[in-house]
């Protein structure tokens, strides 16, 4: 999974590298970057983008917004746009939040205990009835809400792991998310994960 990043330390590291004015950079990923001006401009853009996301996240936290609200709201301005195939702004927001706040989000008492929501999914499925859950999941998919579709199909499948309708809706939601990822940010991790979920689907 994604580790919690250290934005302040990362910004300081970029400032140190910029001050060195290197002619060649050997990154951890991809090919070497050559040319002092190209390197300087690239690192300055990354530094300023990270600083922007950091500051916007802190401002949102101080305004009392939840991490999920900020993940939806915070976007890079046009002058700081970056390719997000290795990282994503919304994931960076979550990482910055946890860097300062830790794992407890102050949203639900249940976060304090080792009993996840999934432990009651089968009971929810029994009470709600799989027919109703399938209808709700399908409505979310029609409305263009594949993540909500996945939430509901997870509940349905907890009650009936082999339910063909729930499995089909889950796969349709995964395909829609994969298409969005491939036609949008093209984030490698997101694409690999979605493909792996489709490959391992029963």
Identify the function of each model-found stretch.
Residues 2, 61-62, 141:
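Hydrophobic/aromatic side-chain positions at a characteristic register within alpha-helices
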Residues 7-69, 73-107, 173-174, 181:
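Divalent-metal (often Zn2+) His-rich catalytic cores of metallo-beta-lactamase-fold enzymes
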Residues 45, 108-134:
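TPR-adjacent "capping" and linker segments in tetratricopeptide-repeat scaffold/adaptor proteins
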Residues 98-111, 174-201:
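Alpha-helical linker/edge segments of TPR/alpha-solenoid repeat scaffolds
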Residues 161-162:
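Short coil turns that delineate tetratricopeptide repeat
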């Amino acid at each position: 999974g994604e580790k919690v990043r250290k934005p302040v330390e990362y910004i300081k590291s970029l400032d140190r590298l910029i001050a060195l004015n290197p002619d060649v950079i050997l990154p951890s990923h991809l090919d070497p970057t050559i040319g002092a001006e190209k390197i300087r401009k690239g690192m300055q853009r990354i530094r300023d983008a990270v600083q922007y996301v950091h500051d916007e996240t802190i401002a949102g936290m101080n305004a009392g917004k939840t991490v999920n609200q900020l993940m939806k709201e915070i976007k890079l301005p046009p002058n700081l746009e970056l390719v997000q195939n290795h990282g994503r702004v919304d994931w960076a927001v979550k990482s910055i939040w946890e860097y300062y706040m830790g794992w407890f989000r102050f949203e639900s008492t249940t976060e304090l205990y080792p009993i996840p929501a999934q432990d009651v999914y089968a009971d929810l499925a029994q009470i709600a009835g799989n027919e109703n859950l399938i209808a709700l999941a399908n409505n979310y998919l029609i409305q263009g809400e594949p993540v909500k579709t996945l939430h509901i199909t997870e509940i349905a499948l907890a009650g009936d792991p082999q339910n063909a309708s729930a499995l089909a809706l889950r796969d349709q939601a995964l395909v829609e998310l994969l298409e969005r990822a491939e036609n949008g940010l093209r984030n490698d991790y997101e694409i690999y994960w979605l493909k792996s979920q489709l490959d391992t689907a029963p």
